């Protein structure tokens, strides 16, 4: 009797495994990871409002080690875009790493760790938050990458890409007050004053029909969202609208083991 039960359990597990493998092969999805700030425990104490959005340096490196040890491929924007259009196939263990807002801590801590582990990432910059030049790093987590630092980063780190998080729309609720023409101007300002790009990340994840229309008119090819509900925190599929690409938020204190489990899920 006991042998029959064990045999039955084995059959069930094999069936589940076959269903899982078949589903993932026929419905390929890629996790787009969303980070914000990186810092030390001491730096986080000085800026309480950033604690929820700030990953400890050690925690971040442990996550990168986990990705490396489990043979994950980190993608460039071009690779992700080509996969989404069906031009290329990618390994199941593929991720796109993104950082929102363009904090100076990304340059101070994250970029060198990503380079150490030979990994790619994309940073979404807020144009009007960027000064011409930066002071030396003083531990203030609310400091943003300057235009001068952006140029240095592009020279020092060929594994890091930069794209738009808007020029001057990073305020809660501001989208409701903007006309279509004002949205077009904001996108033009970013390209003229910061960098040329065809990839966008919605400020606070907010978008509407005018926003999407203006992005298309401005020759943006992809746009990433951030929530706002739990169902939008999921892996991206080829079927997702190119202007509503979902991401997974990497929360403060997330253990590498928990992140690995999330990445291995098919949704």
Set out the residue ranges of the language-model regions.
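C-terminal active-site subregion of NodB/CE4 polysaccharide deacetylases
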Residues: 4-7, 20-97, 173-267
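Core hydrophobic alpha-helical transmembrane segments of single-pass membrane proteins
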Residues: 9-17
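Active-site beta->alpha N-cap acidic-glycine motif
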Residues: 30, 48-152, 159
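Short loop/turn segments at strand-loop or loop-helix junctions that form parts
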Residues: 34-38, 125-128, 164-169
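Catalytic metal-binding/acid-base residues of hydrolase active sites
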Residues: 102, 167, 203-206
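Extracytoplasmic/secreted cell-surface and envelope-processing proteins
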Residues: 106-107, 131-134, 170-173, 208-211
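Structural detector of well-ordered beta-strand residues that form the stable sheet scaffold
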Residues: 122-124, 161-163, 201, 221-224
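Histidine/lysine/aspartate-rich catalytic loop segments that bind and position anionic ligands
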Residues: 147-150, 154-185
């Amino acid at each position: 009797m006991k042998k029959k039960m064990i045999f039955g359990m084995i059959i069930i597990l094999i069936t589940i495994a076959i269903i899982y493998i078949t589903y993932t092969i026929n419905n390929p999805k890629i996790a787009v990871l969303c980070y914000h700030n990186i810092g030390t425990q001491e730096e986080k104490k000085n800026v309480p409002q950033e604690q929820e959005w700030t990953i400890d340096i050690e925690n971040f490196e442990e996550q990168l080690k986990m990705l490396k040890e489990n043979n994950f491929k980190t993608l460039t924007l071009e690779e992700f875009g080509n996969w989404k259009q069906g031009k290329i196939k990618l390994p199941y263990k593929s991720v796109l790493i993104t950082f929102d807002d363009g904090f100076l801590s990304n340059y101070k801590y994250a970029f060198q760790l990503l380079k150490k582990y030979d990994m790619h990432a994309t940073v979404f910059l807020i144009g009007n938050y960027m000064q011409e030049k930066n002071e030396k790093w003083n531990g203030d987590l609310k400091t943003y990458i300057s235009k001068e630092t952006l140029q240095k980063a592009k020279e020092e780190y060929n594994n890091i890409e930069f794209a738009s998080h808007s020029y001057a729309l990073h305020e809660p609720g501001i989208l409701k007050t903007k006309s279509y023409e004002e949205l077009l101007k904001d996108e033009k300002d970013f390209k003229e004053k910061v960098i040329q790009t065809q990839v966008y990340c919605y400020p606070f994840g907010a978008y509407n029909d005018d926003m999407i229309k203006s992005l298309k008119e401005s020759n943006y090819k992809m746009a990433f969202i951030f929530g706002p509900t739990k169902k939008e925190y999921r892996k991206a599929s080829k079927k997702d609208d190119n202007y509503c690409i979902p991401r997974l938020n990497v929360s403060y204190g997330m253990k590498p083991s928990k992140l690995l489990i999330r990445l291995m899920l098919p949704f």
